[in-house]
From Swiss-Prot:
GO biological process: alkane catabolic process
PROSITE patterns in the cross-refs: RUBREDOXIN, RUBREDOXIN_LIKE
Name this protein carries in UniProt: Rubredoxin-2
Organism: Clostridium perfringens (strain 13 / Type A)
InterPro entries in UniProt: Rubredoxin, Rubredoxin-like_dom, Rubredoxin_dom, Rubredoxin_ET, Rubredoxin_Fe_BS
């Protein structure tokens, strides 16, 4: 599964970890995160994330 980085603050979304504090279970791919999810650090939406290694 691919990781995605927030272009604003540098937060890295790792699908293996998810974002359980915000309702995203481990194992959830970025494309499967709800559209209303926002970066847990800076609050921008999914459109502000880019694929990373």
């Amino acid at each position: 599964m691919k990781k995605f980085i927030c272009d604003v603050c540098g937060y890295i979304y790792d699908p293996a970890v998810g974002d359980p504090d915000n309702g995203v279970e481990p194992g959830t791919e970025f494309k499967d995160i709800p559209d209303d999810w926002v970066c847990p650090l800076c609050g921008v939406d999914k459109s502000q994330f880019s694929e990373t290694e």
